[in-house]
A protein has these predicted regions:
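Conserved "HGTGT" condensation-loop signature of ketosynthase/thiolase-family condensing enzymes
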Residues: 1-80, 100-101
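Active-site-proximal alpha-helical scaffold in enzymes
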Residues: 83-102
Length: 102
C-alpha cells in the first residue's frame, strides 16, 4: 500500500476557550466521542494514537501513553509528535506511515 492510499476519515475539535474549567482529559474524551460519532467506529477498533504535545502535558514524556490510559484505549501504536508548529502535519504523516506498515 502506498502512503497516498491512506485517508483521513474523520476529525474532531474542541471549542477554544481561554482558561477553560474543563480538564484536559475531559477535552480528550470529547474529541474521542466526536471522532467515534463521526466515523461510526467503535472504541475497541482504535489501535493507534498519535498526539502533538500540549502545554498541559508538555512536561510528561509519556503524554500520548498517559492520554491513551486516561481514555481507556488499548493500542498497538502510540506516539507523541513534538516538532513545533509542524506537529499536526507530522502526526498525519506518521499515522499514514504506521497504517502503511501495518
Amino acid at each position: 500500500m502506498a502512503l497516498r492510499d491512506n485517508a483521513i476519515v474523520g476529525y474532531a475539535e474542541t471549542k477554544i476557550v481561554l482558561r477553560s474549567e474543563v480538564d484536559v482529559w475531559e477535552l480528550g474524551a470529547e474529541i474521542l466521542d466526536g471522532i467515534l460519532e463521526q466515523t461510526g467506529f467503535e472504541k475497541g477498533e482504535i489501535d493507534g494514537l498519535i498526539l502533538s504535545s500540549s502545554s498541559t502535558g508538555a512536561g510528561n514524556i509519556f503524554w500520548s501513553q498517559t492520554t491513551a490510559d486516561q481514555l481507556a484505549l488499548e493500542l498497538d501504536f502510540c506516539q507523541t509528535v513534538d516538532i513545533g508548529g509542524s506537529s499536526p502535519v507530522g502526526a498525519v504523516a506518521r499515522a499514514a506511515a504506521a497504517i502503511d506498515a501495518g
